[in-house]
């Protein structure tokens, strides 16, 4: 049923006669004040619009160097994956954060990354990249003076954990390309497209309940290992511009490097970068029946160029230990259900490390977990690696530097209760990797 329109009659309403008001005029002073008020309101409005539209924030990058006299140089400072370099870098980066976050304004200081620690007669020299966000109308030189003033004031107060030589401090504005090149010299750093660091079955065949990757460059070390004519077989992890880390069982059926290709990017089709494989190295003591020593290396015929979307992960020091319930991430193109199809888009899942004592319980894996294996997932199941994820990375975020701690190896089905994923423990094979690659 439709509602009919309501009919109005002019005669239904009495006619109202309004008394005409006598015409009035404002005096000149009141008129002038009113005009000034309107102009002020318009001016404020234009200012606000200009602030948000014209003065968009822009990234500014600087390369700083200074001498620290309270630190004696150690040989391992020259090895970026060493515990000594990592710990000292974090100390310096925390110091820079305290200096600039308090004085640069909310959100102005973004991040710092130590690039190099080198020897000096008086201690050590530090080379570090500093990143800030300021209005685009600001100039790099003006911001540079602001940074220098803030740094010198902090040195005068003498409340820093390190003794820094004031005359040694130098600061140079750099462009985004130079900044990327410097950061690309470090491993395990993720960058967004706007050049801001991003603040997280036992066969070849194995992320259930994960999600699709949010953006290119979120997991830039992830690779797809593909058998020519058969497509995606396994995941792999970029650890240098020519070497990838993967699982030995991925090559069980075919060890001929000429039959394999490697692609990078968040999709298998189309790939972002494609490379041929020149060499395959399988651990000499790999045992397929027990899954022990399930680790292999693949060398590319042509090196890859590091960028925001293709980057190497850090190899951990052999002494790195992760306690149970440490948050880690597994990524891959594997199926999302047991025996399901490979996914074209890269997926990720957050899982937790599980102690070997728990994993070796009779109701879990009943003693099958060896020192070279690492369990991760949840005892209640639901989130896990699966078919097609094998060989891919399990990574750990240590203060925005990412380390590969596991390689997807085996498990009983996918995401079952009391059957977490089992990974090759990378720290156990750190010396083996170094002996084969020099890394």
Swiss-Prot record:
The active site is at residues 249, 294, 390. Residues 207-438 form the Peptidase S1 domain. Residues 58-176 form the SEA domain. Residues 1-33 are cytoplasmic. Its EC number is 3.4.21.-. One of its GO terms (biological process) is proteolysis. Pfam families: SEA (PF01390), Trypsin (PF00089). One of its GO terms (cellular component) is cell surface. The chain crosses the membrane at residues 34-54. Its main location: membrane. InterPro entries: Pept_S1A_HAT/DESC1, Peptidase_S1_PA, Peptidase_S1_PA_chymotrypsin, Peptidase_S1A, SEA_dom, SEA_dom_sf, Trypsin_dom, TRYPSIN_HIS. Disulfide bonds join 234-250, 359-375, 386-414. It comes from the Eukaryota. One of its GO terms (molecular function) is serine-type endopeptidase activity. Keywords: Disulfide bond, Hydrolase, Membrane, Protease, Serine protease, Signal-anchor, Transmembrane, Transmembrane helix. Residues 55-439 are extracellular. The keyword Ribonucleoprotein does not apply. Belongs to the peptidase S1 family. This is Transmembrane protease serine 11F.
């Amino acid at each position: 049923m439709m509602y009919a329109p309501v009919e109005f009659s002019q005669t239904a309403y009495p006619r109202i006669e309004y008394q005409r008001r006598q015409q009035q005029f404002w005096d000149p002073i009141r008129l002038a004040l009113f005009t000034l008020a309107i102009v002020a309101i318009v001016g404020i409005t234009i200012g606000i619009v200009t602030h948000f539209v014209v003065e968009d924030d822009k990234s500014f990058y600087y390369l700083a160097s200074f001498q620290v006299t309270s630190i004696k140089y150690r040989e391992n400072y020259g090895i970026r994956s060493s515990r000594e370099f990592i710990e000292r870098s974090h100390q310096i980066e925390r110091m820079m954060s305290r200096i600039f976050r308090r004085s640069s304004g909310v959100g102005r200081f973004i991040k710092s990354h130590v690039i190099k620690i080198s020897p000096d007669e008086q201690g050590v020299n530090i080379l570090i990249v500093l990143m800030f966000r300021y209005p685009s109308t600001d100039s790099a030189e003006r911001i540079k003076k602001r940074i220098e003033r803030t740094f010198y004031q902090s040195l005068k107060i003498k409340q820093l954990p390190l003794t820094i030589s004031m005359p040694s401090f130098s600061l140079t504005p750099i462009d985004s390309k130079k900044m990327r090149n410097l950061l690309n010299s470090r491993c395990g750093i993720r960058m967004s497209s706007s050049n801001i660091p991003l603040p997280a079955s036992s066969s070849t065949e194995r992320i259930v309940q994960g999600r699709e990757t949010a953006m290119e460059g979120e997991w830039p070390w992830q690779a797809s290992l593909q058998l020519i004519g058969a497509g995606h077989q396994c995941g792999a992890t970029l650890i240098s511009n020519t070497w990838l880390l993967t699982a030995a069982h991925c090559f069980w059926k075919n060890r001929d490097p000429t039959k394999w290709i490697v692609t990078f990017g968040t999709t298998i089709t189309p790939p972002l970068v494609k490379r041929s494989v020149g060499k395959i190295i399988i651990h000499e003591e790999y045992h397929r029946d027990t899954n022990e020593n399930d680790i292999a290396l693949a060398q590319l015929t042509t090196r890859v160029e590091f960028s925001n979307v293709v980057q190497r992960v850090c190899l951990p020091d052999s002494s790195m230990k992760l306690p149970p319930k440490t948050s880690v991430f597994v990524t891959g193109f594997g199926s999302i259900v047991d025996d399901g199809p490979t996914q074209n888009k890269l997926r990720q899942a957050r899982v937790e490390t599980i102690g070997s004592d728990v994993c070796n319980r009779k109701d879990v894996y009943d003693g099958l977990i060896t020192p070279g294996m690492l369990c991760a997932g949840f005892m209640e199941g639901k989130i896990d690696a699966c078919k097609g994820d094998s060989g891919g990375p399990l990574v750990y975020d240590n203060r925005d530097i990412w380390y590969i701690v596991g390689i997807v190896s085996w498990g009983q089905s996918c995401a079952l209760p009391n059957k977490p994923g089992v990974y090759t423990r990378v720290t156990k094979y750190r010396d083996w990797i170094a002996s084969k690659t020099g890394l």
